[in-house]
Amino acid sequence: MSLLTPDIGLLFWMLLSFGIVFFVAAKYGFPVIVKMVDERNAFINKSLEEAKQANKRLRGIKEEEERLLKETYNKRIFIIKEANEMRIKIINDAKEKANFESNRLMKNAKENIQKEKELAMQDIRQQIAALSIDIAERVLRKSLDNKHEQLNLINELIKELN
């Protein structure tokens, strides 16, 4: 028996043992292995599908985030614009009220000045009238014959009043 050329009996028994092992493996081992490979394949496919769905949801969340950011930005712009409009309106209202109040105060001040002026003019007229009467009375007391004396008397009386 040579190592390189086996005998027919050995070959027969090797083929028979290989056939029995193959038959047992095919009947009991391969279905389990195939089942495990199929389960693993199904698990991998399921995981891939879940990953795709997760990516899809993540994209949806990112799109929602971008939409919310844009919406928030637009609302912020609107609120800022509205606040500026309110600020301008408040400033304009305050200016308008200040102008109205200023005009009212100026009108009242002018009226008061006019009244004071009229009262002062009336007082001056009364004083002039009283002075005129006083001067006339003093002039009449003196002799009316000399004009030069009358003028000196009037000048003297004016100096006394000052």
Swiss-Prot record:
Its main location: membrane. Disulfide bonds: none annotated. It holds the Pfam family ATP-synt_B. It is found in: Cell inner membrane. The chain crosses the membrane at residues 6-26. The keyword Cell membrane applies. GO terms for cellular component: plasma membrane; proton-transporting ATP synthase complex. Belongs to the ATPase B chain family. This is ATP synthase subunit b.
